[in-house]
Amino acid sequence: MTNTALPTSSADQENDTQLNELHKSQNAVVLLSGGLDSVTCLYWAKARYASVTAVSFDYGQRHNSELVAAKAIAETAGVNHRIIDIDIAQLGGSSLTDHSMIVPDGDTDKFPDKKRDEIDNDAIPNTYVPARNTIFLSYALAVAEVTDSNHIVIGVSSVDYSGYPDCRPEYIAAFQHMANLATKAGVTGHHLSIQTPLQQLSKAKTIELGLSLGVDYGQTISCYQADANGLACGVCDSCALRRQGFAQAGVADPTHYQS
């Protein structure tokens, strides 16, 4: 079934204008990994909110090139940047934190129908880090409280992604519900929202959005196993999705690959 957009009424336009003005007086926290999706979210938030704090994590990931990228991106964007140290690597269970595990090559055709709600456990790649988004969002929630922020922005998508369960809309809705039950801000009437501007966007559409906002994708690193110089492997799932996105957007890929 094709969805047809309804005409926008003057009342709807007025409500949108009022909402935009409200957002311009509010603050936001953005999860910034240093990758394509998160930097798009950072610039999206900058265009909407009064103040933005970027939060990155040194969690024992396979390489620190993405953190180097995140620092440079935050500096270019002119936003406050916090890097939080947490050692998820000690838990294991992911090729992104356990060097004894092999990062699988990417395959952008593995889910051609995009019905990600039907993905079973066998289809979730070993690059999934157990409970990572829950851990990251929990820290971001704490930062939101201490920075008087009403919004947390995260670059999850249900379209071009690797099949991780904590990227789905129902997960985000559940976390937002929990956030407003479990925080001082939530119970005192200062509603906290989890914003997912990329949720229904393909990688190509995400790139188009970012370029319209002034993003320099040459600063970003998406690779799961970039080398010490920040060169991407070109074959992991994240690299495959990135390559496909730039190709579909008809935009030159500024990524520096190992081969």
Curated annotation (Swiss-Prot):
One of its GO terms (biological process) is queuosine biosynthetic process. Its EC number is 6.3.4.20. InterPro entries: QueC (IPR018317), Rossmann-like_a/b/a_fold (IPR014729). Its cofactor is Zn(2+). It catalyses: 7-carboxy-7-deazaguanine + NH4(+) + ATP = 7-cyano-7-deazaguanine + ADP + phosphate + H2O + H(+). Keywords: ATP-binding, Ligase, Metal-binding, Nucleotide-binding, Queuosine biosynthesis, Zinc. Zn(2+) binds at C223, C233, C236, C239. The keyword Secreted does not apply. Binds 1 zinc ion per subunit. ATP binds at L32, S33, G34, G35, L36, D37, S38, V39, T40, C41, L42. SUPFAM superfamilies: Adenine nucleotide alpha hydrolases-like. GO terms for molecular function: ATP binding; ligase activity, forming carbon-nitrogen bonds; zinc ion binding. It comes from the Bacteria. It holds the Pfam family QueC. The keyword Nucleotide-binding applies. It is an enzyme of class 6 (ligase). Pathway: Purine metabolism; 7-cyano-7-deazaguanine biosynthesis. Catalyzes the ATP-dependent conversion of 7-carboxy-7-deazaguanine (CDG) to 7-cyano-7-deazaguanine (preQ(0)). NCBIfam families: 7-cyano-7-deazaguanine synthase QueC. Belongs to the QueC family. This is 7-cyano-7-deazaguanine synthase. The gene is queC.
